[in-house]
C-alpha cells in the first residue's frame, strides 16, 4: 500500500497528475481543487495517497493533506458515493466547508458537486453527522460549553483559545479559526463562553465560504 508520494509534477490530465518519483511515473487521481493548487511542471510536490485495489486495477488518489484523505474515505462510506463523487465533492468544498455544511444540514453545498443530487446530498448529511468523529466530538463540546458552562464565566482568553481549538478540530486552519473567533468575541463581548464563540464563528465561516 502506498501512503504518500513525493516527486516532480510530470503532466496533468482532466482528473489526474503524473508524478515522477525517481524516474517512475505514477498516475494519481485528484480533485479539481488539488490539481489547481499543484506547482508547475517539473516542480516538486508531495501528496497523501489512498490506494484502492480492485481485481482488474490499482488506482491511486492524491490529496494535499491527510485530513483531505480521511474525508475522501469517510465520504465513500455513504451509500452511492464512490471515489469519483467523493473527489467531485472535494473539488467544491474544503474539509472545513464540508464540516460546516454537515453542521448546518446544507444540502445545496453538496449538490454543487457533479453527480450529487438532492437525495444523495440528504443521505450524506444524515449519515456523516453521526460517522464523522471530529464533527461529533466538536458538536458535543459546543453543546456542553453552551449549557453546563452557564453561570461559570471562564477567562476571556481561555474561552477564545477553546473556541479556536474546536474549529481546528473541525478541520479549519488555525489562522482562519483565530480570525473568525476574534470577530465573534468582538461581536459578543468579553464575557462570551467558548460554545457561543465557536457557534458564531461557524456561522461567520459558513457565510464567508
Curated annotation (Swiss-Prot):
Domain I: where is this region? 1-64
Q: Which SUPFAM superfamilies match?
A: DNA helicase RuvA subunit, C-terminal domain (SSF46929), Nucleic acid-binding proteins (SSF50249), RuvA domain 2-like (SSF47781)
Sorted alphabetically, the Gene Ontology BP terms of this entry are:
DNA recombination; DNA repair
Region span, Flexible linker: 144-154
Its domain of life reads Bacteria
Q: Where in the cell is it found?
A: Cytoplasm
Annotated region described as Domain III, given as residue ranges: 155-209
Pfam families hit by this protein? HHH_5, RuvA_N
What do the Gene Ontology cellular component annotations say? cytoplasm; Holliday junction resolvase complex
Q: Which GO terms describe its molecular function?
A: ATP binding; four-way junction DNA binding; four-way junction helicase activity
Q: What keyword terms does UniProt attach to this protein?
A: Cytoplasm, DNA damage, DNA recombination, DNA repair, DNA-binding
Query: Domain description from the entry?
Result: Has three domains with a flexible linker between the domains II and III and assumes an 'L' shape. Domain III is highly mobile and contacts RuvB.
| Function according to Swiss-Prot or TrEMBL | The RuvA-RuvB-RuvC complex processes Holliday junction (HJ) DNA during genetic recombination and DNA repair, while the RuvA-RuvB complex plays an important role in the rescue of blocked DNA replication forks via replication fork reversal (RFR). RuvA specifically binds to HJ cruciform DNA, conferring on it an open structure. The RuvB hexamer acts as an ATP-dependent pump, pulling dsDNA into and through the RuvAB complex. HJ branch migration allows RuvC to scan DNA until it finds its consensus sequence, where it cleaves and resolves the cruciform DNA.
* Assembly behavior: Homotetramer. Forms an RuvA(8)-RuvB(12)-Holliday junction (HJ) complex. HJ DNA is sandwiched between 2 RuvA tetramers; dsDNA enters through RuvA and exits via RuvB. An RuvB hexamer assembles on each DNA strand where it exits the tetramer. Each RuvB hexamer is contacted by two RuvA subunits (via domain III) on 2 adjacent RuvB subunits; this complex drives branch migration. In the full resolvosome a probable DNA-RuvA(4)-RuvB(12)-RuvC(2) complex forms which resolves the HJ.
Q: Tell me which family the UniProt entry assigns to this protein.
A: Belongs to the RuvA family.
Report the protein name in the record.
Holliday junction branch migration complex subunit RuvA
Amino acid at each position: 500500500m502506498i501512503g504518500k508520494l513525493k516527486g516532480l509534477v510530470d503532466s496533468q490530465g482532466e482528473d489526474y497528475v503524473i508524478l515522477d518519483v525517481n524516474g517512475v511515473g505514477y498516475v494519481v487521481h485528484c480533485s479539481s481543487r488539488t490539481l489547481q493548487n499543484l506547482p508547475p511542471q517539473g516542480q516538486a510536490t508531495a501528496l497523501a495517497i489512498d490506494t484502492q485495489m480492485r481485481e482488474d486495477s490499482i488506482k491511486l488518489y492524491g490529496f494535499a493533506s491527510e485530513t483531505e484523505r480521511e474525508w475522501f474515505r469517510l465520504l465513500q462510506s455513504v451509500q452511492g458515493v464512490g471515489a469519483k463523487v467523493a473527489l467531485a465533492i472535494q473539488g467544491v468544498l474544503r474539509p472545513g466547508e464540508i464540516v460546516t455544511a454537515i453542521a448546518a444540514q446544507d444540502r445545496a453545498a453538496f449538490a454543487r458537486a457533479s453527480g450529487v443530487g438532492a437525495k444523495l446530498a440528504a443521505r450524506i448529511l444524515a449519515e456523516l453527522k453521526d460517522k464523522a468523529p471530529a464533527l461529533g466530538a466538536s458538536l458535543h463540546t459546543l453543546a456542553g460549553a453552551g449549557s453546563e458552562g452557564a453561570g461559570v464565566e471562564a477567562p476571556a482568553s481561555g474561552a477564545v483559545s477553546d473556541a479556536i481549538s474546536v474549529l481546528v478540530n473541525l478541520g479549519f486552519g488555525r489562522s482562519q479559526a483565530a480570525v473568525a473567533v476574534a470577530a465573534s468575541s468582538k461581536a459578543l463581548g468579553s464575557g462570551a463562553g467558548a460554545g457561543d464563540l465557536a457557534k458564531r464563528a461557524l456561522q461567520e465561516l459558513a457565510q464567508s465560504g
